[in-house]
Amino acid sequence: DSSQYGSKCSLGEPSCFAVESESLLDYTPSDQAVFNEEAFKENVLKGLAFVAENDRFLSLGVKPTRPEPGYGYIQLGDAEGDNLYNVQSFTEKPERDFAKIFVDSGEFYWNTGIFISNVKHLRESFSRILPAVLRGFDESYRTFDVETENAYMKQNFPSYPNISVDYAILEKSDNVSVLKCDFGWLTSAPGTVSMRQCKERG
């Protein structure tokens, strides 16, 4: 489906690795709804500043308002700074009973699927965890025009695993942090409560 295509495409996006290693990346899935843009901007800027100084992935977590089995959850570990925590664990789409336990514990935040990283760390992680994704990538490339990028994707796309970056990289890394956010968030991903349903519920 389209969400899988987007995930698969993003895994092999050569332009992400063609920029300078000091560059920073904000990965935001297209199925997101953000209701407080100013708060979102502040959180992203704080996250970019964090990964600029740390070779870590930073997930944006949102405090759950209900036990939603269609969402992923991030368990908070040790505090690392102002609203920053080490990630203790990821849980994807738990049963409703477990989702309720997560919400009641106060230790779990919704996983928005949004993460921030510096390009150097992202590339190193792909090389270690999913080397096939970078196969065929010529490190000498520093600029991809549309024609070159399309040719690269045509050659390499079929070999990419059909998996999101969350599953492929973040959940297999031991250096992931989470930023507690409050910017009003929903996703239209399959299996979740729709925006219309949420409005109807008040």
Language-model-derived ranges and their functions:
Residues 1-79, 123-129:
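Conserved beta-loop-beta/alpha segment of the NTase-like Rossmann-fold superfamily
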Residues 71-202:
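Catalytic core of tubulin tyrosine ligase-like
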